Amino acid sequence: MAFHCQRDCYATELLTEVVSCHPAQLKLENGGKKNTVSGFNVLLKDTVLFPEGGGQPDDRGFIGEVPVLRVIRQGPDAVHFVASPLDPATEVLVKIDWNRRFDHMQQHSGQHLVTAIADSLYGFKTTSWDLGRQRSVIELDTPLVTTEQLEAIEKIANQKIREHVPVHVRLITVDDPEFDMVRSRGLPDDHAGPVRIIDIEGVDANMCCGTHVRNLSDLQMIKILGTEKGKKNKTNLIFLSGERVLKYVSRSYNTEKTLTSLLKNGPEEHIEAVDKLQKSVKALQKNNLTLLRDLAVLTAENFKSKADRGKFFSLHRKEGDNEFMNIIANVIGTEDTLLFLTIGDEKTSGLFLLAGPPGIVEKFGPRVCEILDGKGAGKCGRFQGKANKMSQRAEVEVLLQKVISSVEITQE
């Protein structure tokens, strides 16, 4: 059975009836993390909300006043996951998030168009595709697509859009002679009922369960951004369709305007200016590294030159790295001196190094790490790692001063 959303992809609401409602759980992504949410699985007599399938994400919307968080297909049914229960046999008005739906329609029909043209022009078969949040990707069964080929595909795609080519939805049975003639990547194992064909008049006929525009003019435009290396002997073609092209142009213009202000030159000079900046930064970083190494040596030699230098050396610097700390330890020497060195923000996080006689470092390294709320490891008289509570540095110094006072360290 085709759902109402498949029979009329432009319908934004539907009056229907709740068939069943059962407690359920679902893993939903929030901020990059998946959390298990308790709710209810609702079946309706029919639905205007598209369940995920055919490479197209599911719709969002409302059943009455209850938000629909997911729609998935289970066999012939569309299962709506909601947070609040709904009474069976109740008449409800189902509404969709039209902006999300129409965006998916534009990308999906755009994929059919690009796929058909790539195949007819160059024999590039589509093996899969992904409708992403920002861009869509078509995986082509070819190791290489040239710039000239991309331009030709894009040109014909936009020509078909300007020609207002109609898009028809037809239903056929699996025993229909046409079944073996249309483009398809196969039916799901649990498919039941008639097979849905999306027919771009004179361009393509393809088996598909997704929602599509009724005319290519509704795509507005297609922009192929380029390609990326895909799986073995595959190429990923990246494209935008419809409103996404306009949003991309807007973002690109705003980025260009910001760069013009920051770089103090015109768009045609941005690449050269950034290249010069990168080279300057690289040179400065190299010079800074040399100066830090020299500073590490001078700091260590200054300590060694003091007659009353003692058996403990402690230093904190905001700037530096592990190499800076290890140079100091190497120059001072760790056989007769205990060193506690830290790099980073005094109140938050950074790096630390405890170096000295192996017995002391092995015993107190983990304790220092614990006080600093850090992670680290040690061997051969050195224990180093990352600290999350650099503000506890003074507590470590007190501990190590006590250690020095209670342990004999032979000093030259």
UniProtKB/Swiss-Prot annotation:
How is the cofactor bound here?
Binds 1 zinc ion per subunit.
Q: Does the keyword Membrane apply?
A: no
- Tell me where in or outside the cell this protein is found: Cytoplasm
The similarity annotation says: Belongs to the class-II aminoacyl-tRNA synthetase family. Alax-L subfamily.
Q: Which GO terms describe its cellular component?
A: cytoplasm
Please list the cofactors this protein needs.
Zn(2+)
Any idea which positions bind Zn(2+)?
H108, H112, C208, H212
Establish whether keyword Cytoplasm is in the entry.
Answer: yes
Per the UniProt record, the source organism is Xenopus laevis (African clawed frog)
What is the protein name stated in its UniProt record? Alanyl-tRNA editing protein Aarsd1-A
Print the organism lineage: Eukaryota, Metazoa, Chordata, Craniata, Vertebrata
Write down the PROSITE patterns for this protein, in alphabetical order: AA_TRNA_LIGASE_II_ALA
- Broad class of the protein's primary localization: cytoplasm
Q: Name one GO biological process term.
A: alanyl-tRNA aminoacylation
Q: What does this protein do?
A: Functions in trans to edit the amino acid moiety from incorrectly charged tRNA(Ala).
GO MF assignments: alanine-tRNA ligase activity; ATP binding; metal ion binding; nucleic acid binding; Ser-tRNA(Ala) deacylase activity
Q: Provide the alphabetized UniProt keywords.
A: Cytoplasm, Metal-binding, Protein biosynthesis, Zinc
